[in-house]
C-alpha cells in the first residue's frame, strides 16, 4: 500500500511533505508519495494576499484533490490554513513545530538595530510590517511575494536592506546561514500556527489513522489555542494578528496581539493546558475588551 499526499509545488512544501513521509515510514511502516498541486496563491504572485482572498488560497486546490480522491491526505503549513475548514475535512495531525520565530535576512549580515535610517525592508505581511513600525518607524516597507529563494533574490533585485521570513522555512530548507538576526517571539509575535505542520484529510477517511499516529499533543495544544484566538477575532491576512504560546508542565502561556480601532493591543493569559481552546478564546475577548 502507498499513501498519496497532496502538497504545494514549492521546494519548502515538498521538503515539509517529505518529513511527513519519513515519519509515516518510521512510525507506521507505510510508503507514500507526493501529489504536487499548483494553488491559486502560488499563481497570483503579483498581488498581496490580503487583496485576493487571504491564505485560504494556498489550500483550496489541495482540498479539491482530497475531495476527488486523488490523495489520501495533505500537508500544509498551519499558518496558511484558515481557522474554519469546510465541513468535509479535518486536521488529523500536527506532527511537528519548527522554530516559531521570524528571522531577519540581509546580505551583509546587518541586524535590524544597526540598519541605516529609512532602510528598505521587504515583507507583504501586515503582521510583520505593523510590528516592525513599533520598533523602527523610519523604515520603508516594500511588499514582496514569492517562495523563499525568490524573496532572497529580491534583496538585490529591489535594492532592499533586508527581508523578514519565517525561521522555520529557512531551517527546513537548510538555509539557516542566511539569517542575520532573530526576532524575540514574545515581543515580535509570530503568525498563528507559524512553524507547525498540519495534515488534512477527509473526515472518516479510510487511511486517516496512519496520519493520526503522527500527531504531537504539545504542538496541537499550542496551535489549537492560537487558532481559537484567531477565530474569535476573525483574523487573517487583512489585519495584524499574532500569537505566541508555550506549554510548561500543565500550564499554557499565551500572548496575543491584534489591531483594535487602529490601535495595536497586546495581552497575555495563563491557564491549564487542557483548556487550550478556551484560553485562546478568553485571550481574544481580553483584547476586544480594550475597545
UniProtKB/Swiss-Prot annotation:
GO terms for molecular function: hydroxymethylbilane synthase activity. It is an enzyme of class 2 (transferase). Keywords: Porphyrin biosynthesis, Transferase. The modification S-(dipyrrolylmethanemethyl)cysteine is found at residue 237. It catalyses: 4 porphobilinogen + H2O = hydroxymethylbilane + 4 NH4(+). Its EC number is 2.5.1.61. Its cofactor is dipyrromethane. Binds 1 dipyrromethane group covalently. GO terms for biological process: protoporphyrinogen IX biosynthetic process. One of its GO terms (cellular component) is cytoplasm. The keyword Mitochondrion does not apply. Pathway: Porphyrin-containing compound metabolism; protoporphyrin-IX biosynthesis; coproporphyrinogen-III from 5-aminolevulinate: step 2/4. Monomer. NCBIfam families: hemC. Belongs to the HMBS family. Tetrapolymerization of the monopyrrole PBG into the hydroxymethylbilane pre-uroporphyrinogen in several discrete steps. The porphobilinogen subunits are added to the dipyrromethane group. PANTHER family: PORPHOBILINOGEN DEAMINASE (PTHR11557:SF0). This is Porphobilinogen deaminase.
